Amino acid sequence: MGKKQKNKSEDSTKDDIDLDALAAEIEGAGAAKEQEPQKSKGKKKKEKKKQDFDEDDILKELEELSLEAQGIKADRETVAVKPTENNEEEFTSKDKKKKGQKGKKQSFDDNDSEELEDKDSKSKKTAKPKVEMYSGSDDDDDFNKLPKKAKGKAQKSNKKWDGSEEDEDNSKKIKERSRVNSSGESGDESDEFLQSRKGQKKNQKNKPGPNIESGNEDDDSSFKIKTVAQKKAEKKERERKKRDEEKAKLRKLKEKEESETGKKDQSKQKESQRKSEEETVKSKVTLDTGVIPASEEKAETPTAAEDDNEGDKKKKDKKKKKGEKEEKEKEKKKGPSKATVKAMQEALAKLKEEEERQKREEEERIKRLEELEAKRKEEERLEQEKRERKKQKEKERKERLKKEGKLLTKSQREARARAEATLKLLQAQGVEVPSKDSLPKKRPIYEDKKRKKIPQQLESKEVSESMELCAAVEVMEQGVPEKEETPPPVEPEEEEDTEDAGLDDWEAMASDEETEKVEGNTVHIEVKENPEEEEEEEEEEEEDEESEEEEEEEGESEGSEGDEEDEKVSDEKDSGKTLDKKPSKEMSSDSEYDSDDDRTKEERAYDKAKRRIEKRRLEHSKNVNTEKLRAPIICVLGHVDTGKTKILDKLRHTHVQDGEAGGITQQIGATNVPLEAINEQTKMIKNFGRENVRIPGMLIIDTPGHESFSNLRNRGSSLCDIAILVVDIMHGGEPQKMKPTNLPKPKKCPFMVALNKIDRLYDWKKSPDSDVAATLKKQKKNTKDEFEERAKAIIVEFAQQGLNAALFYENKDPRTFVSLVPTSAHTGDGMGSLIYLLVELTQTMLSKRLAHCEELRAQVMEVKALPGMGTTIDVILINGRLKEGDTIIVPGVEGPIVTQIRGLLLPPPMKELRVKNQYEKHKEVEAAQGVKILGKDLEKTLAGLPLLVAYKEDEIPVLKDELIHELKQTLNAIKLEEKGVYVQASTLGSLEALLEFLKTSEVPYAGINIGPVHKKDVMKASVMLEHDPQYAVILAFDVRIERDAQEMADSLGVRIFSAEIIYHLFDAFTKYRQDYKKQKQEKFKHIAVFPCKMKILPQYIFNSRDPIVMGVTVEAGQVKQGTPMCVPSKNFVDIGIVTSIEINHKQVDVAKKGQEVCVKIEPIPGESPKMFGRHFEATDILVSKISRQSIDALKDWFRDEMQKSDWQLIVELKKVFEII
């Protein structure tokens, strides 16, 4: 037994040392314990079990010998529910340990059996004791946290003290506490008691018999000191440590991320070097000084997991530690040697160097990172700007499409797609689907309604199919939600960037998913970034140089292959830069435009065609041949009746002017003058080198001269290369004579002046076969003087316009001085000189302008219906060439018309294009020519706008848009009124002329149209019958009126005025308006009451009653026959109606303000006659009795007869009569 006790005491000392080490660990690195609370608890439980087992053996041996065993058992029964049973037994038995050591062996077997019983009782316990065990372990922790020094002192004192006193005290305390528990005191006290018991048990376990008392004293003192505040403080301390640890972890994570973005390998190498160096330094330090660094001490402390495994090795470790300590103490006594000091110094120097090197590297790394960050920010900024530009372009594109009416909503796009699908289906089934343009314009056939049912059925089928497909896609999407690729964490930025087009982005994402999941069902779109590139290219082509345009075009021609390569490159970039934000942005931009791919196939084709057209135009502008000249377009301008057409007639030997309505040109005509005719006309000019003529001929355009046709003049002079301004030498200072000179100036068109009608000079002798300069010399002196005088006057007028002018034979500088050519269209004098000058000027000054160019430029001048040919268009071909069979796009009333050229007709040389001739048919026509084009659907063509040729089918929509833009500009200039006449003309030019004329004449127009008058035009005009019947009129200028339209107009009451001359039309309309007004005035003359105010002259009362005849002064307004009079001052008494007015015994209809007249006032029929002196006095003012109806009648039909003062009087009388 003695041996056993000795062994046990040794074990307890070892445990004591162990606990000391643990306490040190807790003080140094309490955080580690908190990190793994569960492990530590498990460890303590195991330790507790071992200790309980050792103590149970001893105590149960002592239990049999003790005298107070029975009393303790009774106590145990009272506290059966509590887990303090064993503890009480242990404490009571320990009190009697020394008394009963002899009977230990005898009762050893009994103790074993009791031990088994105790274990069974422990297993039967509920969860409550477990919780108390944990509480006990917490107290143990508290105990372990006590400082080392205090414990050491306590141990030393324990060796000296005797344990008997402590045993007695313990037994007393146990009894008292058991009584408290049995008497049912509060549970808190029992808990405290249990904790104290467990603490004491720990002390007993840690220290052998002689040290029991001091341990208990320590325990008691620890429990006394530990208040609630202390516990809270400790808890706070633990929480703080936890927070510190979390922060440290976060820091580590951040450092890791930074190191990952940087060069990982270098950082690892540095760390490994640093660690190795530190270890070497530490090992040297420990060897030299014997001082273990705190970090190593911490490392040496065993973890909770190691403690379980190292339970058996504790003894050996402790012995080793003791040995080490002794060695260290010896080394300390000796002190460090010189070698060690030197080694330490070297190590420190190395450390310093290493630290400096690391510092430098760290600074370099930070600098690099900063540079990278700056670079990244710059890239982000550029990317942002790029995105904003794209957004702006997209916005502009959408606005453009919106303006053009091409911006479709999702539903519209779907509808279009369905329609396209139905068309394809019809074509697949073999049904011929004619194109919109190729359909012949026919009268409506009622079979169409039946035909429409077939496509509707097919469309419904198509809709159902598309619905099924959509449903399938949705099912697939629902079925595979896990596979959705989560976008990188730059999503919020992406959302910010695409706020404007947010909906498009979501659509794009959906479309991306669909393409990934349902590749079989969906159409695979090869080109992702194409629409965006095309947008950019389109803008760049407008702004950048030609070379860039060519490169882009080449890139475009490569097609989908190049785009796929681009995609691969972008994919590689994405994989390379995972942490960079750029790829995600690229993806976002892709996704933005992916959604466009479905709906912008047409747009892509449109852009491609647009670029092709632009490139072709550029190439043509480069390949200009200055050696080969085209025929110049010569425009004849001038005032009406100056003889423009007559000059051309003389040139052509025709009589066009005689055939014109009223001898006035109202349309633009064109004449081709061949080279032979030029040579013929200029044969009398001596210095004219016929061999040097490079131009193939001339195209002369005749324009109307009247002011109302200024737009036609404008149109003509915009085409022409050089202009002839015809001025009548006999009439100076005409309003329009100098006006045409303003036309060529803004157009930068050179011009020359023909001083026409020189044959009107007195005693002029004609000589058409000689030069005009020679002819002038042959004239008499008086004729010469008159000519010079008139010519000088015209030169002065030009000078007033800011132009230098001189007679052509005196002009030495044609660039600065305008040449004046005296001509006579009647006799033919000066015509040769005129043509000679034209040829000279065009060849010398306009060679670049006349250089041959393949780029087509043509203008529609007139639209004419010819018998046997249908509707034809007269076109001035300025540049390029036209071939039979070309697809042309011409402007139309209801939009651009696409048609094929059926025939190209040219009038014979020297014949007017607009006059019916025996036309010559050509397969191809070169510029410059006046051509008549035959084709389908040309009825609604608008004159005055360009004609375009589409060489490929995809160019048609681009050219259509160009024409629509042109047409919008011209029609926006025409502003319609709510009330007004309906105007129809044969051409856009004449329509504009007529509208200009109506505007100056203050005639409002509510509707316009070009072409013959149909029933629909009459219907439109009839709307005015409801608003204002005087404007229910159609002014038809130079157009045919359909018979059914005339019949309908007659039945509805719409007047149609038709005339071939603009002035006749206007005269007819003004006459109609006047007649209509007279009718209305006659109708409303009894309702309309003119305002007047009269003062009675009391000395001129000729008859006071029935009728009242008296003299009055008109104070305001005007008195007319039939004006009802009343007296406002006498309760508005009606005195009668003015039947006659006399001035100086002469009867008049009206008496104005300030006149003294005699009036005869007859009583109102059916009323008693009023009397002067009874019903009204001489002091009373007489006024005309007005009403709302009378005021309206005056406004509508008698406005011309009213003056401003009359309207002011009406306002005054309205207040008197309280008229609203």
Swiss-Prot record:
Q: In which residue ranges is the amino acid composition biased (Acidic residues)?
A: 109-118, 491-516, 531-569
**Biased-composition ranges for Basic and acidic residues?**
7-16, 170-179, 231-282, 323-334, 349-417, 434-449, 570-588, 598-608
Where is the major localization of this protein? cytoplasm
Q: Residues annotated as region G2?
A: 663-667
Cite the residue spans of the region called Disordered: 1-417, 430-608
Q: From which residue to which does the signal peptide run?
A: none
Q: Residue ranges of region G4? A: 756-759
Under Enzyme Commission nomenclature, its number is 3.6.5.3
Which CDD domains does the annotation name? aeIF5B_II, IF2_aeIF5B_IV, IF2_eIF5B
**Where are residues bearing Phosphothreonine located in the sequence?**
301, 498
Q: Where is the active site?
A: 706
Q: Please list the residue ranges that the record marks as compositionally biased, kind Low complexity.
A: 20-32
GO MF annotations in UniProt: GTP binding; GTPase activity; metal ion binding; translation initiation factor activity
Sorted UniProt keywords: Cytoplasm, GTP-binding, Hydrolase, Initiation factor, Metal-binding, Nucleotide-binding, Phosphoprotein, Protein biosynthesis
Q: Where in the cell is it found?
A: Cytoplasm
Q: Name any cofactors this protein relies on.
A: a monovalent cation
| A Pfam family the protein falls into | GTP_EFTU_D4
What this chain does, per the entry, is described as: Plays a role in translation initiation. Ribosome-dependent GTPase that promotes the joining of the 60S ribosomal subunit to the pre-initiation complex to form the 80S initiation complex with the initiator methionine-tRNA in the P-site base paired to the start codon. Together with eIF1A (EIF1AX), actively orients the initiator methionine-tRNA in a conformation that allows 60S ribosomal subunit joining to form the 80S initiation complex. Is released after formation of the 80S initiation complex.
Assembly behavior: Interacts through its C-terminal domain (CTD) with the CTD of eIF1A (EIF1AX) or with the CTD of EIF5 (mutually exclusive) through a common binding site. Interacts with eIF1A (EIF1AX) from the location of the start codon by the 43S complex until the formation of the 80S complex. Interacts with ANXA5 in a calcium and phospholipid-dependent manner.
Q: Which family does it belong to?
A: Belongs to the TRAFAC class translation factor GTPase superfamily. Classic translation factor GTPase family. IF-2 subfamily.
Specify the protein name. Eukaryotic translation initiation factor 5B
Organism the protein comes from: Pongo abelii
Q: Which gene encodes it?
A: EIF5B
